[in-house]
Amino acid sequence: MSIISEHGFRMDGRRPAQIRNINTRLGLNRNAEGSCYLEHGNTKVLCAVYGPYESKASKRLEDRCAIVCQYSTTTFSGLERKNRPRGDRKSTEISRLLEKAFESVILTESFPRSQIDIFCEVIQGDGSNLAACVNATSLALADAGIPMKGIASAATCGIVETKPIVDLTSREETDLLPRVTLATICGRDEVILVELQNRLHIDHLSVVMDAAKATCADVYECLAVVAQQHLKACAPILGN
């Protein structure tokens, strides 16, 4: 089956530039400083943030806060059952990508000699998993009251022949489309994460990057509304 039909629709009924619905709930994990449950279409992610707290000597940075991320997936999260939901090569790679991205977002110099732990778990994966984790982490950090440069937003975009498609599903990803996962701050041009999957012709790179940046801006608008509403809801409680 073609990824884009002759009438211009994808397999799930979306247009090429249309993102899936985003639903969130903040503060579900009362043991964490901040948490977020995010549904991006059928992709479902839980994120919990702990800290800042005094770090161990082995991870202590004198001038800033250390960011430690752990990415994992449930054994039933994808199309295939997984025997090692965390600690495998791919999970470790994504954990490092998240760390580097949020080192650029969090005002780490505000908490020298301390550490912030971020745990992301994909409960159900239906494509754009890394992007969903970035978006959930941004809201979990906002829930925790961690000072940031702004809210980070992310999107995964691919290309079919010469046409970009945004917010890929797992079915679209399994077709081995060239794709880019991009994250920016406040939906602007400050890029904090780029991951390229499969070979992408240099002539198509700018097309995919432009589509990804535009999609990050759309996602940011959704996340910003959630963060603002959550802040308003918490304001009376903080005032007391």
UniProtKB/Swiss-Prot annotation:
Assembly and binders: Component of the RNA exosome complex.
Protein name: Putative exosome complex component RRP41
Superkingdom per UniProt: Eukaryota
Native species: Caenorhabditis briggsae
Localisation per UniProt entry: Cytoplasm; Nucleus, Nucleolus; Nucleus; Nucleus, Nucleoplasm
Listed GO biological process terms: nuclear mRNA surveillance; poly(A)-dependent snoRNA 3'-end processing; rRNA catabolic process; rRNA processing; U4 snRNA 3'-end processing
Recorded GO MF terms: RNA binding
Gene behind this protein: exos-4.1
Pfam name, any one: RNase_PH_C
Predominant place of localization: cytoplasm
